[in-house]
Amino acid sequence: MNKLFKQIAGVAFAATLGIGFAPQAKAVEVQEVISDGGIRAWLIEDHMNPLMTMDIAFTGAGASTDPEGKLGLANMVSGLIDEGAGEMDSQTFRSEMENRSISLSFDAGRDDFSGSLTTLTRERETAIDLLRLALSEPRFDDEAVERIRAQIVSGLKQAENNPRDIASRTFFASIFGDHPYGRQPSGTLETVAGLNANDFRGFVRRAFAKDN
C-alpha cells in the first residue's frame, strides 16, 4: 500500500510545479496526469494562491458495499481514519494538521469513499504524509472509536424523528427495496453498536487499493 501512496504523492506534487501567476482571463485547462504506477488524475493549475488541493475517490468502496449486519461501516471509517494514524494518536494527529493549516476530510457515499486535502504548498510533503498515514495506518484507538460512535448514534436518534430524514429513508426504500441502495449509509443503531476495530481494519484492506 505504501507503494500506492508514493504514486499518489507523485501525482499530487505535479500540482505544485511551476509556481507563478497566470493571467486572470486565461481559460481553465484540465490536464490528465498518470503516474508510473498507473494512478490517473486530473490536474487544474491555478497559481494565484500558494495552495494545493487534492480530491481522491475509491470507487466500489461506498456504503452500498457494507456487509449485511455491519451497515454504517464505511461511514464510521470515514469519521475515524483521521483520528490518529501511525505513531500519532488522535490529539497529536489533529494538532499536526491544525498547526500546519492542513485540512483533511473523508466521506462515504453510496458508491465510493472519497477524501479531500487542502494545504499550503510549503506544507505539501507533511500533508501528503498525513494523508498516506490516514489511509494506510489508521489506529482505531478505543477512545476515538467510542467518541465517533457516540456522534453517529446521536445523529441516528435525531434522524428518527426528522421529517427530511424520514422522507429520504422512505424514498430510497420504496425505490430500491432490498437493493443496497435502499439502505441508509449511516447504518442503524443496532449495526453501529456492533462495529469494532477488526471491522474497520478489514474495510481499509479491502477498500483502499489502486483497483478501486
What are these regions (language model features)?
Residues 8, 24-25, 139:
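Generic low-complexity segments that are intrinsically disordered, proline-rich and/or Lys/Arg-biased
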Residues 2-4, 13, 34, 42, ...:
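Charge-rich, well-structured scaffold segments of protease-associated domains
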Residues 20-96, 114-121, 125, 129-132, ...:
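His/Glu-rich zincin catalytic helix
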Residues 5-6, 74:
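Residue-level micro-sites within transmembrane alpha helices that shape
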Residues 9-20:
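Bacterial N-terminal signal peptides
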